C-alpha cells in the first residue's frame, strides 16, 4: 500500500521498504527514476536498528544525539537495505521524524517507511491533501494531518 502523508515541509509518499512493487509504483506515479534512491523515515529509533547495526557504537550514539529532528544521516548501506531503496548509491538516507503523521504511520506499520515528496518529478510538491488527490487519484491512501511539526 502507498500512503500520502504530511511531513514537516511538504506532503510525502511512502510505503514499506521491503515492498519492491510499491516502491516501483511510487517511482512510476512520480515519473522518477529508481536509481535515485529513497530516504527511510520513522518516529521510533528502534525501527532503524537493522540499518545501523553495522556502525560503530560511537556513530550510533552520534545519530541518537541529533534525533529525533530534521537531521538526515547518510550511512553506508548494509545488506538490510534493498537495492530498490538505495538506488545506484552505496548509502542510505535515514531520518527520525517528530512529525505526528510519520510517528503514527511508522508505529502502525511497526517499521521505517520510505519517503519522497508527493509530486511529479521536477514539479512543485503537493502542499495539501487535495493537491495529492489531484496528482495521484485513488492510487494512494491519504492520511489526515497538517504540514509542520
Predicted regions span which residues?
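Active-site-adjacent structural elements in enzyme catalytic cores
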Residues: 1-149
